[in-house]
C-alpha cells in the first residue's frame, strides 16, 4: 500500500520536498496545506511557491488562516494520513492535531538539531561562520523544533558559499532525506534520538536592520554577514541619509591606525574602508532607485570622497 501523505509547506525551500514525495511511486499526496495567498501590489494576490506547485501537479490544496481550526482538524481526521510532512510551513501545529497524529508528523529542518531551532537556520549558519551545516528530520511536538531526531545529513562549508547556494543544497538534501525516512520509517523511528537541550540554540527571523554594516566589527564578521544576508536584506551603509546597498566585498586582514569606518582609498578596484582588524573592499554597490554597478562603472559618473567616516 502507498504511504498516504498530507504535505504542509509554503516557500521555495519546501517545493523540492513536495515534488520528490509526489514523484515517489510509494507515496500518495492526499492534500497540501499552505499559507494564505499574499497581497503583492495593486490588490493582486500571489500564491505561495508550494501552492503553485501543488496546483500544477493537480493536488488538492487548502490555505487556512489557522491550521489548528476545527474544519482543518476534521478534514485531517477524515483523510487519516500515514504521515503529515511539515517543511517551512509558517504556523505551529497545536496539541489536538499532534495528539491525533502522534509520531506521524515529520518536519524537515535546515540545521543540525538542536542547533538553530527556529525561523532562520540557514542564515545563522553563515552569519556565525560555521564549518558545517545540514538538515534534520524530526518528529513534531509542542515545543519549537524540539522533537526527537530521526535522521541527519551534513555538508561541509567553505568560506565562499553564499546564502542562495546553501539554501539550494539543503533544499535538495532535505528532499532526499525525508523520502528515505518515509520509505523505511520503522528503522528510522526505532533509532530516533532525543535532542540535547544543553546544546540547543534558537534563532529568530531576519530583519532588514541586520544588514547595516558596522565597521567597528572585525572583517570576518562583516564578511559572514554578507554571505548570510545576501540577497535579503543585503548589506548596506548610510551616506548623507542615503542607503547604499553593497553587492560584493572583499576583506583584507591588516593592522592599521585608521578610524573604523574611514574611507581610506577609492579607485577602480573598490572603496577601501577600515574596520576593526583590517579593511573591507566594496567592489559593487547600488544607489537608491538605481541598478547595481561595479565601482569602476560607478566612478565614471560619480565620486566617493576619501577620508569620510561611514
Swiss-Prot record:
UniProt xrefs under CDD domains: FMT_core_Met-tRNA-FMT_N (cd08646), Met_tRNA_FMT_C (cd08704)
Keywords recorded for this protein, A-Z: Protein biosynthesis, Transferase
Class of this enzyme: transferase
Residues that hold (6S)-5,6,7,8-tetrahydrofolate according to the record: 111-114
InterPro entries: Fmt, Formyl_trans_C, Formyl_transf_N, Formyl_transf_N_sf, Formyl_transferase-like_C_sf, Met-tRNA-FMT_C, Met-tRNA-FMT_N
EC number: 2.1.2.9
Catalytic activity annotation: L-methionyl-tRNA(fMet) + (6R)-10-formyltetrahydrofolate = N-formyl-L-methionyl-tRNA(fMet) + (6S)-5,6,7,8-tetrahydrofolate + H(+)
GO cellular component terms attached to this protein's record: cytosol
GO molecular function: methionyl-tRNA formyltransferase activity
Database matches in Pfam families: Formyl_trans_C, Formyl_trans_N
SUPFAM superfamilies for the chain: FMT C-terminal domain-like (SSF50486), Formyltransferase (SSF53328)
UniProt keyword Transcription regulation present: no
Source domain of life: Bacteria
Reported function: Attaches a formyl group to the free amino group of methionyl-tRNA(fMet). The formyl group appears to play a dual role in the initiator identity of N-formylmethionyl-tRNA by promoting its recognition by IF2 and preventing the misappropriation of this tRNA by the elongation apparatus.
Stated family: Belongs to the Fmt family.
Protein name per its UniProtKB record: Methionyl-tRNA formyltransferase
Source organism of this protein record: Finegoldia magna (strain ATCC 29328 / DSM 20472 / WAL 2508)
